[in-house]
């Protein structure tokens, strides 16, 4: 895009650039006038670069006019003194001016000599290109590249979240995540639930104080469970699911993680996702609570009687029973196994 502008440096400007590269100047201000790069002002060193910086740079920045500033550091590389290239494009400047200066940046760097430019700083407000702003820029350059909010959320979820439905033969994993402490009231409520003194416990994260606290212990029937799910904030729920299955009366503890989509802040979603696995580890190991099922929902309306029953007692796929093996000869079969690994075959007697 820089070639489309046709803007070049005049011979006078090139001569000043040459003297500047040799250390004569501390600062050059360059503008675009009549389709040429021109020197607006220049200054010689007065003190060390950091003491000169703000007093030299900031007074030259106009509120509605873009410009370029080349500021010389005291350090040198193989080609000579090192420079900071500042591209100033204030918010209130004309759009055409912004585009013109953006398109000519590469031309200016080529004319001056890119090997002399140590850092490039872009600013729309003075704080961006002040000495403090430059130091913040250096700090950001030494840190990992920043992610977008969505990328950061996804990264945290992938790093911190460990599968909670693991088989009995799964090797032990070090659980990663944010292990916020659990308040005394919340822990006591979970103990009561485990002892069947409560049938519902709702927990929330106190984000400001970084602790998991008790939110609700209202006696809850299955038909009332959807009403307990907030529509504008995340929660953890432990529910004592009383039901019958194949003629047996069962009381099963179900963990429900409710996250109402994107009505919550990114920070809230990240924290609830990260704290979930450490919370379950504490509950299952320290309280010896048998959590029969872990469910994630974004809407309380999902918690119907049929949904919960099928989550706790998943239906067997019909095709698994479609091709039954024929029975072997009488007297040749061993004791029938109820659970068989994939590699196992029917045991036979001697």
From Swiss-Prot:
Residue positions, PTM Phosphoserine: 143, 277
Pfam families the record matches: Cofilin_ADF
PTM description: Phosphorylated on serine and threonine residues.
UniProt superkingdom: Eukaryota
InterPro entries tied to this protein: ADF-H, ADF-H/Gelsolin-like_dom_sf, Twinfilin
Cellular component annotations (GO), alphabetically ordered: actin filament; myofibril
SMART domains assigned to the protein according to its UniProt record, in alphabetical order: ADF
Keywords attached to this entry: Acetylation, Actin-binding, Cytoplasm, Cytoskeleton, Phosphoprotein, Repeat
Region (Disordered): 316-350
Domain annotation ADF-H: ranges: 2-139, 175-313
Modified residues (Phosphothreonine): 349
Modified residues (Phosphotyrosine): 309
Modified residues (N-acetylserine): 2
Gene Ontology MF term list: actin binding; actin filament binding; actin monomer binding
Family: Belongs to the actin-binding proteins ADF family. Twinfilin subfamily.
Subunit structure: Interacts with G-actin; ADP-actin form and capping protein (CP). May also be able to interact with TWF2 and phosphoinositides, PI(4,5)P2. When bound to PI(4,5)P2, it is down-regulated. Interacts with ACTG1.
Function: Actin-binding protein involved in motile and morphological processes. Inhibits actin polymerization, likely by sequestering G-actin. By capping the barbed ends of filaments, it also regulates motility. Seems to play an important role in clathrin-mediated endocytosis and distribution of endocytic organelles.
Name of this protein: Twinfilin-1
Organism name: Pongo abelii
Name of the gene encoding the protein in the UniProt record: TWF1
